[in-house]
Amino acid sequence: MKKEDKDWIELTIITSSQAVEAVSAILYNTDVQGIAIEDSKDVEFQKKNKGDWDYFDETLINIEEGAVIKAYYREDKNFMKYLKYIEESVKNLEQLGFDKGKGIVTTSKVNEEDWENNWKKYYKPTKVGEKIVIKPIWEEYGENPEEIILELDPGMAFGTGTHETTRMCIESLEKYVKEEDVVFDIGTGSGILGIAAAKLNAKKVIGVDLDEVAVDSAKKNVGFNHLDNIEILHGDLMEVVKGKCNIIVANIIADIIILLSKDVKKFLEDGGYFISSGIIKDRKEEVVDSLKENGFKIEEIKEQGEWVCVVASL
């Protein structure tokens, strides 16, 4: 007897590019099973840098200004509670300093088989920086010998390197990671930044995350890349990591980076680098001021779209 497909709920949020990370954070506070993002800023970047892409989805060209975020939920008794929370949180984004854009939230049903297969169309091989290529494990890619390939199964809830914050962090890792370096990746998510550091010949990499789902995802991705110089830990940096490193990378949010700037020094060797992103432009000065107040020297500030990456050193 054929197994009957279950229905899922596809929740669609139309917002601004600036609010993508904030809306994603709202969704992660619920029992979301997957997220797909169509961002006009990403499409604009792809069009300008089309030569860096193995694949460019022409069907995304007509995305309106802003972003469309699709989240997937099991159809169960808890969904209406999540929906109310999401609607209220999106409505309140402007009180937190975000442009919510249209701020429209809608829902529809989607068949399980369609959901499981169709989300993968959003992820194609992507060149990031000088030589790193992020390749979903199900995609074929004719690699160049000079390129560094990162095999990734992002699942539905983690980034694949196309977002500006991830891209700027990887570009910074390419610039600053040296052989024999030890690198700590805070809030590792899919493990993409830690894996990039390991592939760039860091001697040792430790990735940490408070989310058990992220830890499991990162460990699987480390396995796909056959790396033995990277360890993924569950917990808080201050509690689970011992020793010092040459580079700390954190792609989180401005508030957490400001908090880290006060304590992260104890984990850095003299002359070490703190690479931070997930910072919206409106919070740039706060982050920079906090780093300076806590003894860091600003090496460089990168900006792409609405986002900022700050590289600081001791």
Swiss-Prot record:
Q: Where in the cell is it found?
A: Cytoplasm
Entry GO CC: cytoplasm
* Major place of residence: cytoplasm
Which annotated residues bind S-adenosyl-L-methionine?
Answer: T166, G187, D209, N251
InterPro entries, per the entry: Ribosomal_L11_MeTrfase_PrmA, Ribosomal_PrmA_MeTrfase, SAM-dependent_MTases_sf
Name the keywords, alphabetized: Cytoplasm, Methyltransferase, S-adenosyl-L-methionine, Transferase
Q: What does it catalyze?
A: L-lysyl-[protein] + 3 S-adenosyl-L-methionine = N(6),N(6),N(6)-trimethyl-L-lysyl-[protein] + 3 S-adenosyl-L-homocysteine + 3 H(+)
GO MF annotations, alphabetized = protein-lysine N-methyltransferase activity
* Pfam families (UniProt xref): PrmA
Keyword Iron belongs to the record: no
The EC number(s) attached to this protein equal 2.1.1.-
For biological process, the GO terms are: methylation
**Similarity comment text for this entry:** Belongs to the methyltransferase superfamily. PrmA family.
- What does this chain do? Methylates ribosomal protein L11.
Quote the PANTHER family the UniProt record gives.
ELECTRON TRANSFER FLAVOPROTEIN BETA SUBUNIT LYSINE METHYLTRANSFERASE
| Name this polypeptide is given | Ribosomal protein L11 methyltransferase
